[in-house]
Swiss-Prot record:
GO terms (BP aspect): lipid transport; lipoprotein metabolic process; negative regulation of cholesterol transport; negative regulation of lipid catabolic process; negative regulation of very-low-density lipoprotein particle clearance; triglyceride metabolic process; very-low-density lipoprotein particle clearance
Family: Belongs to the apolipoprotein C1 family.
GO cellular component: high-density lipoprotein particle; very-low-density lipoprotein particle
UniProt name for this protein: Apolipoprotein C-I, basic form
GO molecular function, one term: fatty acid binding
Pfam families the UniProt entry points to: ApoC-I
Miscellaneous field: Apolipoprotein C-I is present in acidic (APOC1A) and basic (APOC1B) forms in P.paniscus, P.abelii and P.troglodytes and perhaps also in baboons and macaques. In human, the acidic form has become a pseudogene.
Gene (UniProt): APOC1B
Amino acid sequence: MRLFLSLPVLVVVLSMVLEGPAPAQGAPDVSSALDKLKEFGNTLEDKAWEVINRIKQSELPAKTR
């Protein structure tokens, strides 16, 4: 009975080993990563300028002088 159950398991394991390594999942593209980084930088810059302009237009600088 043990031999009867272990043979199918052995066949499955052997087929998995002989199949070889799995193909790599989509390799990350360097240019798309750089584009995302550039977009993030531009967004951050826009938000920073927005905050600076809001501070300049507020009464806070006049009150602190």
